[in-house]
């Protein structure tokens, strides 16, 4: 399943939930430098969907806050629940 996420770096409260436009919000404590925020976002999304970190891949948006991720085996109901937070 492809998921659009919006990464918010340097957040005091890291986590996954809520939405900004059509994108799932992923808050990370890491700065948006050297791919640190992206790596943290991939790990948080993997944990939120209960899949291994290695199975979540970045499709587009390596240098953007809005990213498209491929999350194989992601449950659409889980996505709806996370967007509603």
Describe each region flagged by the PLM.
Residues 7, 28, 71-73:
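Hydrophobic residues in beta-strands and at strand termini
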Residues 8, 12-15:
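Active-site-proximal or metal-binding-adjacent scaffold patches in catalytic folds
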Residues 47-85:
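C-terminal structural segments of small proteins and small subunits
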Residues 10, 21, 76:
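ATP/adenylate-binding site constellation spanning eukaryotic-like Ser/Thr protein kinases
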Residues 15, 19-51:
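Compact, glycine-rich, soluble single-domain proteins
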């Amino acid at each position: 399943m492809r998921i659009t996420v919006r990464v918010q770096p340097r957040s005091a409260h890291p986590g996954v939930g809520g939405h900004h436009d059509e994108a799932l919000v992923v808050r990370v404590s890491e700065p948006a430098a050297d791919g640190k925020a992206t790596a943290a976002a991939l790990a948080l999304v993997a944990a939120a969907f209960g899949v291994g970190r290695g199975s979540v891949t970045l499709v587009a948006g390596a240098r953007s806050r809005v990213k498209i991720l491929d999350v194989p085996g992601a449950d659409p109901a889980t996505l709806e629940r996370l967007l509603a937070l």
